[in-house]
Amino acid sequence: MRNIGIIINKEKDKENKILNLVILKVKEYLNPDEIKVIDQFYKGDYKDLMSLDLLIVLGGDGTLLGVARKFSTVIDTPILGINIGNLGFLVTAEISELDEALYRIKVGDYKVEERMLLSCTIEGVTCSDERALNDIVVARGTLSRMAQYEVFINDELYATFKGDGVIISTPVGSTAYSFSAGGPLIMPNLQIVSIVPICPHTPNSRPMIIDGNNKVRVKPLINESDVFVTIDGQKALKLEKHNEVLIKKAKEFFRIISFDNKSYFKVLRKKLFKIE
């Protein structure tokens, strides 16, 4: 691999000790022509990133979600996620496994898996086209009253309910907010979407699984409530009356490196269920 990029969450490595260690190990195992350290809030020319053969992301799940949201539309470089955060459910390896991970990449003992992304557009809002690796949430504000939501699938009304909101989740996001709201766990390689009401006040409002090629439209009936759309829990936009949120599978994918010894169910047991 000739060109390697590194993105690090500086809040978790203020003295650059981890960054310097990773640079040293990358040189030792992969011997690249160039190592480019990229700020996680990068605002430069994305063309500079298109030549990367590998992008190493140092942080936790939040850092990885931010990278997916910001860079997925401009580069399709395979990503090696190294956890230096807390949960680290989405990452490829822990920082303690750095040597093993880089060695596996060196000898070609790895896979590049594609993860589905969601595209979110808000009708009536300029430049609202966003990407989400986990979920898109349409929900009331903290101090708002319960709101009413209409959910359409391919322009056909699916449900109308009152509640706190609705989560539109990818398979990757099924272990996040959707899981806490009673949604199902979904294997991350599938191309499906879950629709999960949040605290619905209607007994028959239940989670729904649909094929990823379907389009979802959420129409909040805004009266006295403030309603927001939140992308991966990181970016929020307030909706105005008559705004509708259009959600569909993005044409891009999030490409992440995986190893055979890190099965989905093994990670589930360890990270989510706390079973070794």
Swiss-Prot record:
Keyword hit for Chaperone: no
Purpose of the protein: Involved in the regulation of the intracellular balance of NAD and NADP, and is a key enzyme in the biosynthesis of NADP. Catalyzes specifically the phosphorylation on 2'-hydroxyl of the adenosine moiety of NAD to yield NADP.
Cellular location(s): Cytoplasm
Protein name in the entry: NAD kinase
Gene3D superfamilies (alphabetical): Probable inorganic polyphosphate/atp-NAD kinase, domain 1 (3.40.50.10330), Probable inorganic polyphosphate/atp-NAD kinase, domain 2 (2.60.200.30)
HAMAP family: NAD_kinase
Family statement: Belongs to the NAD kinase family.
Catalytic activity of the protein: NAD(+) + ATP = ADP + NADP(+) + H(+)
Gene that specifies this protein: nadK
Top enzyme class: transferase
Gene Ontology CC: one annotated term: cytoplasm
MF-aspect GO terms: ATP binding; metal ion binding; NAD binding; NAD+ kinase activity
Entry annotated with the keyword Cell membrane: no
